[in-house]
């Protein structure tokens, strides 16, 4: 008689436990046990419980390879979902086997789990294990499907179609499943979030935290009448009265210094969209800036051509915004532009704007604005640039290049890699809650009656159009961080804390990935010969990049260095890159004139006519301001249940080498965090968005 001691861990999140019956079957190389009910006197499988059980077998089962968890109805109780963390089994010879689950069992079902050692297809020889791999992938591909959200954008996780309940007093003008949360000013497509699989949803704690923060803020705006006010702001200082939540050093600094040229230039380096600016070596024909125009702003003893040759001239070009249509908000036509902004990095170490053109086509009705123009002309020209920056940030840098791409990475992972695959173990922590937050984003942002329809001048169609254009130009090289800085010519630009911190995190991450990859892939042949890996890469190319060859994204990977680069890009995109464009979002957008989502008057065509009154009349009205601010506040505040980069409480790797690599990675991140905090002590505006302590493992907000 062989005795196996079993430990079963239930998740710690509220409602993780179950009243259903749980049975276990153990499969080894020399046989399998009978199905045995795991049952003690009293409650089993309560939230946070680690139950200990004994399984008796007539003979030793040999090396344990698979277990089966059977979830069945208990007495008269209704179906009760269960979140299983892991199962550990101590064999008669004293060896401990670990079977990671970290997933929900929703209905009455059987879940087969493999022993935790990471293995590629080439590492498996037993027919039962090879068949298990195939069956797991087949089941996931039957369950998780790709779906086109909008043509030209990455595909996303299909939400099953449910017939809405019949309502006697249904509004025929409201799309099915759209509704309001009390006080919240926009429609939310509940179907996009309600029917997600449990394994893709927020935990109960995170869900509660998210909606508890949302409701009171919305109701406060509603009670004060702000969400019904379609008038212009009377005074700039009135905008400060709607600052949401707790103010910070940065948000206060933004409100005080937003109109200054030095802060305007600073945001291109260390704001929430720090990946746009590039060195300019030649003034483009479409932006006819002359030396006479800008010479007074370059300093003594120099000229525009000399500064171009020295590498001190930089360009922000918003050409991707050109020709996008606008909508009406609060009954008033909104306006749009695609500006160009020329900046100079002076000897005092500051990035300063020196010329702005509010169109991609020069002409008499499109003057070039200069710092020497009237105060309100220059300020309004800069505000138009900040308006374009809003869409460059929200549509491209934030939503497309992190959220939507990361969701495609996640779904391809689930559909093509079994849980025992080392890449699954490496990447799965970086997909946590991404599908859930993207479903919320689609329900709130890109929904008929949502934010883009009620708070943005481009509307749903225009906002999506910007992303479609950006995806058509996205390249693999641009996602490879070190190459991006070189390609934009900013690799040696002083005071670029985003670059310094992102490269530090990238290097730590790349070293960690290298150690893991080289442990499981000893040769290039091992990479090229892994069919599951190749299927994952191929599906990303097809569903995320839409099969566009010009993107430079690989269809397959042939060498170990290629795999290291690819995986590093994936993890960085899902963690640090998102933190860089998301964490500071509210601090830079809470003061609306610094980041307006709509403009109510056309771009100025004649100098000398702008006044405070015309400036205020161009900014968004009170209602639009509050709607935009409320939604951005909701979607930028990380709810509870956080997991900082490098913290992996779910144990997927059990081998000693990858465990050492994880610990070394954590130590490197701790050093980076210390260095960032020491540097920030000497800065007037601290840059902490890439402090590893504040970087989430995954895109979860």
Curated annotation (Swiss-Prot):
Gene Ontology process terms (BP): arachidonate metabolic process; ceramide biosynthetic process; establishment of skin barrier; hepoxilin biosynthetic process; linoleic acid metabolic process; lipid oxidation; lipoxygenase pathway; positive regulation of gene expression
Cofactor note: Binds 1 Fe cation per subunit.
Tissue expression remark: Expressed in B-cells, hair follicles, foreskin keratinocytes and adult skin. Also expressed in psoriatic tissue.
Pathway stated in the Swiss-Prot or TrEMBL entry: Lipid metabolism; hydroperoxy eicosatetraenoic acid biosynthesis; Lipid metabolism; sphingolipid metabolism
Compartments it resides in: Cytoplasm; Cytoplasm, Perinuclear region
Cited CDD domains: PLAT_LOX
Record-linked Gene3D superfamilies: 3.10.450.60, Lipoxygenase-1, Domain 5 (1.20.245.10), PLAT/LH2 domain (2.60.60.20)
Notes on how activity is controlled: Increased by calcium.
Annotated Pfam families: Lipoxygenase (PF00305), PLAT (PF01477)
Ranges where the PLAT domain occurs: 2-119
Cofactor(s) demanded: Fe cation
GO MF annotation: an example: linoleate 9S-lipoxygenase activity
Domain Lipoxygenase: 120-701
Record-listed Fe cation binding positions: 398, 403, 578, 582, 701
Functional summary from the UniProt entry: Catalyzes the regio and stereo-specific incorporation of a single molecule of dioxygen into free and esterified polyunsaturated fatty acids generating lipid hydroperoxides that can be further reduced to the corresponding hydroxy species. In the skin, acts upstream of ALOXE3 on the lineolate moiety of esterified omega-hydroxyacyl-sphingosine (EOS) ceramides to produce an epoxy-ketone derivative, a crucial step in the conjugation of omega-hydroxyceramide to membrane proteins.
Name of the protein in its database record: Arachidonate 12-lipoxygenase, 12R-type
Organism field: Homo sapiens (Human)
Lineage: Eukaryota, Metazoa, Chordata, Craniata, Vertebrata
Gene that this sequence comes from: ALOX12B
